[in-house]
């Protein structure tokens, strides 16, 4: 009887599984290629989501066998994942209007903004997080927090756990950097950290939100943290109204929320009070968990790779000696000179990306990607971790090698930086009259070749008329000389800019063949270009107008530039920055997060060494395949201001004052 029951149970499970396979096949039928057929997909049991199977049962789909595009499941919804770099650029390109952000698990204010609102938010928050002025202002705050940690009782006890002590240290540091030094700031930040560090119990309550109405321990804790997260509204309001000092005695502490408020105040449009109270742009998963993950993984790898630790110490020592600095006096410019440390962080992000997938996009209309039909409403994602560990992209991808990242130290792989919000506003405030003088000649460029003769006659007549107006134009140019110079750097009218770029790009394509990503590159239009058509001599004047777009920090992607890169170079750069996202929606806090981690590493590793601290039950935690849940011992023999060249520690002389 017992065996019969087991047999019936097995039969029922098999029938259910086969029925599930049939339903999945029917659900994924539209994802079809005209030759290859239906798209590859993960196994049916992943219809319940990857979370329980990967974490609880340690089961993972064999993604390498699925190709460059495949579908996997989040409950009943198929999510198409793409690993081809060109397809990723196509979907996640900021100019793509068919693929909008979609994330139903997070009803964030980020996703209800559209059009010019997104550009305005992006401009202000980008400047606050990435301007050199902002980073220089916030760096002393980071240094003071690290020194406080070194002098604390926890640090002096020598043995620290990354799960407890290092995490608490990072919470205090990040709350001070982002929100300020008040207790409200710390409690608000910690509550947001818990929001993005959810457990299975949180996930279960997300699936069944009515459970929160039951007076349980979890629901009470949830409501308490929710109220603490609401403190952000108060902190943002204080920052918003505190930009203008009421008296000379007022002191505004350096924090990112105050810098954002100041940047908004100095911006040409700025943010309203309700907009600056939106927490999603400042307190999100990447800004909160990103630096923590980077620090823990880097400390773990440096313990495992003593030769890399020695190279970092050597670079710190060389930069300090070169610039006459020490651990107390180094500044932002000194850190920017540490290229090997930069490469080490990039390699950490490649091997252990803070987030394994990019934020999904949703198709507004049906499309084809890599030949497969993608129906309207399909969610598309990018498996970052799988791409960054793909042998076709990196040789020996599972090995930690910072040297492989040094190729990206070439300036062409780096986005040009901006100094302050005034630079963007200044470049966009040029004279509209001076731009119009350049733009009036554009219609003659955009005419078809069949009408060139008629246009030449018309242009001659126009030139005669223009000669009569030369004196007026010269007077305008003379009076607005400085404005015209600014005009060569920025378009004032975005509508005219778009119409010119769209029209002129097609003309340039017809004349000059190129495999460059940016069709408007200057080297194809200079005097050495082989343009033999006499009717197109006016194109030699175009570079001055194109220079407007090239030097504009917004239109020329001071945020996200692929200008003058080949397709291969562009793909290399996409892979390099993939841990932080791609396109206009990539993580804005990348440079700030890296500055925080660099400062921590420079201060700690210029004075201390790290060793494993193993208990009898801790050996399995030191497996390099696991997350760095290890304990770290700060060597008590090292005293500041020593600089460690290798594990054989010795003192070095202080820099001369």
From Swiss-Prot:
Q: Could you tell me which Pfam families the record lists for this protein?
A: p450
Does the entry feature the keyword Oxidoreductase, yes or no?
A: yes
Disordered as annotated region, ranges: 440-486
Localization (cell) = Membrane
Q: Which residues cross the membrane?
A: 2-24
Q: How does it sit in the membrane?
A: Single-pass membrane protein
Q: Which InterPro entries match?
A: Cyt_P450, Cyt_P450_CS, Cyt_P450_E_grp-I, Cyt_P450_sf, Insect_CytP450_Detox
Gene Ontology cellular component terms for the protein in this record: membrane
Asked if 4Fe-4S is a keyword of the record, the answer is no
Q: Which residues bind heme?
A: 587
Q: Which UniProt keywords apply?
A: Heme, Iron, Membrane, Metal-binding, Monooxygenase, Oxidoreductase, Transmembrane, Transmembrane helix
State its cofactor. Answer: heme
Q: Which CDD domains match?
A: cytochrome_P450
Query: What spans are recorded as compositionally biased (Low complexity)?
Result: 446-486
- Which PANTHER family does the entry mention? CYP9F3-RELATED (PTHR24292:SF54), CYTOCHROME P450 (PTHR24292)
User: So what family is this one in?
Assistant: Belongs to the cytochrome P450 family.
Protein name per its UniProtKB record: Probable cytochrome P450 556A1
Its lineage reads: Eukaryota, Amoebozoa, Evosea, Eumycetozoa, Dictyostelia
């Amino acid at each position: 009887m017992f065996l019969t029951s087991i047999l019936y149970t097995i039969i029922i499970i098999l029938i259910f599984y086969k029925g599930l396979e049939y339903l999945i096949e029917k659900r994924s039928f539209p994802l079809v290629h005209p030759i290859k057929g239906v798209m590859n997909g993960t196994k049916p049991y992943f219809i319940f989501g990857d979370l329980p199977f990967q974490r609880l049962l340690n089961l993972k789909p064999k993604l390498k066998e699925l190709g460059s595009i495949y579908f996997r499941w989040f409950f009943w919804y198929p999510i198409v994942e793409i690993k081809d770099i060109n397809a990723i650029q196509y979907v996640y390109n900021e100019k793509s209007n068919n693929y909008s952000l979609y994330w139903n698990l997070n009803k964030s204010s980020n996703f209800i903004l559209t059009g010019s609102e997104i550009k305005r938010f992006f401009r202000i928050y980008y400047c606050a997080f990435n301007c050199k002025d902002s980073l220089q202002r916030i760096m002393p705050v980071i240094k003071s927090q690290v020194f406080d940690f070194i002098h604390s009782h926890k640090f002096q006890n020598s043995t620290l756990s990354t799960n407890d002590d290092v995490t608490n240290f990072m919470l205090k540091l990040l709350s001070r950097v982002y929100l300020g030094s008040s207790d409200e700031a710390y409690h608000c930040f910690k509550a947001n950290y818990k929001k993005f560090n959810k457990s299975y119990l949180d996930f279960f309550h997300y699936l069944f939100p009515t459970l929160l109405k039951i007076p349980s321990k979890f629901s009470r804790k949830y409501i308490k943290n929710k109220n603490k997260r609401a403190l952000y509204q108060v902190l943002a309001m204080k920052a918003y109204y505190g930009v203008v000092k009421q008296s000379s005695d007022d002191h505004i502490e350096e924090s990112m929320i105050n810098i954002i408020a100041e940047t908004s105040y100095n911006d040409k449009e700025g943010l309203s009070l309700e907009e600056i109270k939106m927490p999603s742009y400042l307190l999100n998963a990447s800004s909160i968990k990103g630096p923590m993950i980077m620090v823990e993984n880097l400390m773990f790898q440096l313990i495992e790779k003593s030769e890399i630790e020695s190279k970092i110490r050597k670079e710190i020592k060389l930069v300090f000696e070169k610039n006459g600095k020490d651990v107390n006096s180094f500044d932002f410019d000194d850190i920017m000179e540490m290229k090997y440390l930069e490469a080490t962080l990039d390699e950490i992000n490649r091997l252990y990306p803070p987030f394994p997938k990019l934020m999904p996009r949703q198709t507004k209309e049906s499309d084809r990607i890599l030949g497969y039909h993608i129906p309207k409403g399909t969610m598309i994602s990018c498996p970052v971790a799988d791409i960054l560990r793909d042998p076709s992209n990196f040789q020996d991808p599972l090995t930690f090698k910072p040297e492989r990242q040094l190729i990206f130290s070439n300036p062409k792989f780096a986005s040009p930086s901006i100094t302050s919000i005034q630079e963007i506003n200044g470049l966009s405030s040029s004279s509209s009259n001076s731009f119009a003088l350049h733009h009036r000649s554009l219609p003659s460029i955009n005419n078809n070749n069949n009408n060139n003769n008629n246009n030449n006659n018309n242009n001659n007549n126009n030139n005669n008329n223009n000669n009569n107006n030369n004196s007026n134009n010269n007077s305008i140019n003379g009076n607005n000389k400085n404005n015209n110079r600014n005009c060569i750097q920025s378009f004032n009218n975005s509508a005219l800019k778009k119409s010119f770029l769209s029209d002129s790009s097609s003309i340039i394509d017809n004349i000059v063949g190129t495999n460059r990503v940016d069709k408007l590159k200057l080297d194809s239009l200079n005097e050495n270009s082989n343009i033999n058509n006499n009717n197109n001599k006016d194109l030699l004047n175009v570079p001055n107008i194109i220079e407007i777009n090239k030097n504009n920090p917004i239109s020329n992607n001071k945020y996200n530039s692929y200008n003058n890169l080949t397709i291969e170079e562009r793909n290399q750069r996409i892979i390099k920055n993939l841990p932080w996202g791609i396109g206009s929606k990539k993580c804005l806090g990348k440079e700030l997060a890296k500055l925080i981690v660099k400062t921590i590493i420079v201060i700690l590793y210029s004075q201390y060494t790290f060793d494993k601290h193993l208990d009898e039950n801790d050996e399995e935690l030191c497996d390099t395949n696991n997350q760095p849940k290890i304990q770290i011992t700060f060597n008590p023999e090292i005293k500041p201001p020593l600089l460690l060249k290798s594990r054989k520690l010795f003192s070095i002389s202080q820099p001369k004052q």
